[in-house]
Amino acid sequence: MNETNEWSRLSRRRQQKKKRKGRITFILIFLFAIIAIVGTYYASKINHTINLITQGVGNRTEQEANEIIKNAKPINVLLLGIDNGAYGRTEEDGRSDTMLLLTINPTQKKSQLLSIPRDTYTEIVGAKIYDKLNHAYAYGKATMVINSVEKLFDTAIDFYVQINMEGLIEFVDAVGGIEVTSPLTFNYENRTFIEGKTELIDGESALRFARMRYDDPDGDYGRQKRQRIVIEKLVEKLMSFSSITNFEQLMNAVSKNVKTDVPIGQVMALKNTYSPALTSENLSQAFMDERQLLLKNNEGQEVYYSYATDEVLLKTSNSIRKLLEKSAVKTYPLLQQREDLYYLTIP
């Protein structure tokens, strides 16, 4: 890809970001919906599934986490969409291709969803290197992503929720398929989608719809947009109990493809206390104003990264701190000393 085409694509992405409206965040609501749709009738099966998906990964003890939720404190939740399997990668070299930081203040009934560019050039905490942020998962799974995001924004992550994209097939089939309207015409792996055409698709087609990247003029942003469409349609189906055609299949898909460190006994309390702040009226979208950075990697290849100045990081950190009811900081504590590493920037 030449520099002109890359710059044109990046410009389109910036313009489209400004047009996006606030929505109910999809990954956390997806987890909540799975639990809420079935009520107490399937309580034992749900509890078994929750036991399978909850894992102690973050930097909070279970007692601390319980107190946070019990006292309705403002929280940060890191939402990760992992590409294990779905894009030809293994568990060892997977990437967190979708990273969202959700800050929720249940008392104010306000929340902010920060989209973190996957190519953000930053320190990978624990690996002693600088790289794209989405590579942190390959180096040290969710723990390293959490630690790297905490340092990048100078804020604590209270909980995380992770969904593997390879589970899309099972999720979609379990609800009897979903209706999607393609934003563009394309063919991927012998499956054709027509711009503006609404159709009912199964799990295999949903995965093809969500994973195509290189034929989209908007590149990775276009792929993320289609992933949002699929997940939002899944949520719509999950909110209607009658839409679930195979409950056992759904629970199996959840246990294999969803992970979180929310304490088992607090999942429903988290939903009941914090979800009112997640409506479209109460949720604001936030984006980082980043420059593009061209570096040579360890193999001497030229690679594009997203680069946030300390001023941008300060502004972003303070927007998070405000919702957490913490004092703003005037100078950013993170000195990354990256300026001597690059030889070309696109302002």
Question: For each predicted feature, which ranges?
Answer:
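C-terminal solvent-exposed extensions
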Residues: 55, 64-65, 129, 262-347
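Extracytoplasmic/secreted envelope proteins and their assembly/folding machinery
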Residues: 96-98, 130, 142-150, 165-169, ...
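Entry/capping segment at the start of metal-dependent catalytic domains
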Residues: 2-8, 16-109, 290, 304
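Flexible, solvent-exposed short loops/turns enriched in glycine
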Residues: 112-140, 184, 191-198
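Amphipathic, coiled-coil-like alpha-helical scaffolding segments used for oligomerization/assembly
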Residues: 134-193, 241, 261-263
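Extracytoplasmic
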Residues: 72-75, 94-99, 108-116, 128, ...
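Second-shell loop/turn segments in exported
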Residues: 86-90, 130-139, 154-159, 214-221, ...
